[in-house]
């Protein structure tokens, strides 16, 4: 069995060959990149198996930051015609909203200068082959540099019980809301608020379904769910616009309500607490991006993450991961996410990506959008 180990198993002399595919200049010169023209799809590497991709490093000189959403990364396993990984390049590496950022987690590390060194350590086994390509959905060319470090094995026996890596990117822009009416309830005195909100005064405030939640992952097959990056853009002022009261819900193998895993709030899902208003990075959870102010604490673009690496979530037939956008789905914000998971068989990693215009981030928010509510006292 292939052991994906850290320091604890580093001294074990496993049987493999160390390999790399990179963009080094085959002439011996220093043009160690490939140029990707506007509209071009380029295969960067084709790897022979059995093997396992252990580390990806990439950098590209972007014409504009929004190319983090214009450029698409795709990975195909074992000659499949559909990609198991299909994701905007920046989001694959955890850079939501096309915002470059230095950060460190257990499996993703964006490094200087200014988050341009893109690193990924998710293990990605394959039995026959791996094909890695990028598509430039912009109009301008850019130089692409890369390392794909992988192990190659004499036999696929080393890959017994290993799943294939998949990625699913999604966006809902904006989410449907009923927040102004919710805010009016909340602004009443606490007894009336509790009575109306929690004891059925308005049935919309009592959510016993995942029907209207934001979907982070919907997949069929036998596998494990390993985590997500979630990006929220509070692009306009809303009364009581803290989005963190949205509960996470994970349904396994088509089970009925209630799900096997039901959370207590968005900030609890990413293992923080009490409406965090600061950036924080830990190996398995954190806040990568926070843009709030004293006057508008939840203003603009936020990015958070939760990895299930020490506690992967097992499913055998299907999994459905969703989260409320505000309590009982009251808020209308721009939600996007990248989810990481493994399946026993290589399949398509989620629905096809939307057109590039529907992937681009919203412009950054002014302090108070015209015509929107001033801060609530």
Question: Could you describe each region identified by the protein language model?
Answer:
Residues 1-377:
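Beta-strand-centric surfaces of beta-sandwich/beta-rich domains
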């Amino acid at each position: 069995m292939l052991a994906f180990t850290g320091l604890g198993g580093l001294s074990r002399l496993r049987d493999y060959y160390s390999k790399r595919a990179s963009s080094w200049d085959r002439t011996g010169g220093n043009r160690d990149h490939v140029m990707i023209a506007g509209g071009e799809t380029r295969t960067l590497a084709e790897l022979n198996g059995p093997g396992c991709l252990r580390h990806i490093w990439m950098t590209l000189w972007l014409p504009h930051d929004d190319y983090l959403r214009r450029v698409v990364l795709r990975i195909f396993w074992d000659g499949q015609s559909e990609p198991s990984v299909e994701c905007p390049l920046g989001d694959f590496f955890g850079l939501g909203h096309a915002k470059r950022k230095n950060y460190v987690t257990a499996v993703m590390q964006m490094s200087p200068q200014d988050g341009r060194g893109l690193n990924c350590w998710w293990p990605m086994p394959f039995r026959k082959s791996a094909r890695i390509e990028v598509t430039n959905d912009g109009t301008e060319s850019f130089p692409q540099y890369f390392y794909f470090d992988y192990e190659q094995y004499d036999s696929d026996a080393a890959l017994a019980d290993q799943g294939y890596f998949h990625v699913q990117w999604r966006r809902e822009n904006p989410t449907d809301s009923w927040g102004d009416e919710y805010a009016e309830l909340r602004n009443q005195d606490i007894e009336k608020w509790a009575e109306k909100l929690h004891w059925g005064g308005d049935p919309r405030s009592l959510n016993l379904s995942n029907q209207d939640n934001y979907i982070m992952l919907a997949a069929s097959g036998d596998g494990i769910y390993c985590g997500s990056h979630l990006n929220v853009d509070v692009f306009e002022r809303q009364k009581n616009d803290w989005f963190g009261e949205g509960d996470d819900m994970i349904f396994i193998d088509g089970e009925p309500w209630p799900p096997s895993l039901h959370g207590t709030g968005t900030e609890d899902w990413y293992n923080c607490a009490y409406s965090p208003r600061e950036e924080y990075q830990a190996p398995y959870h954190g806040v990568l991006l926070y843009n709030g102010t004293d006057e508008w604490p939840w203003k603009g673009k936020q990015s958070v993450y939760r990895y299930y690496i020490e506690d992967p979530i097992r499913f055998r037939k299907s999994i459905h991961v969703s989260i409320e956008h505000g309590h009982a789905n009251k808020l209308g914000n721009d939600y996007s996410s990248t989810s990481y998971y493994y399946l026993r068989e290589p399949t398509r990693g989620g629905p096809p990506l939307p057109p590039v215009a529907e992937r681009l981030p919203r412009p950054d928010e002014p302090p108070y959008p015209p015509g929107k509510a001033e801060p609530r006292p």
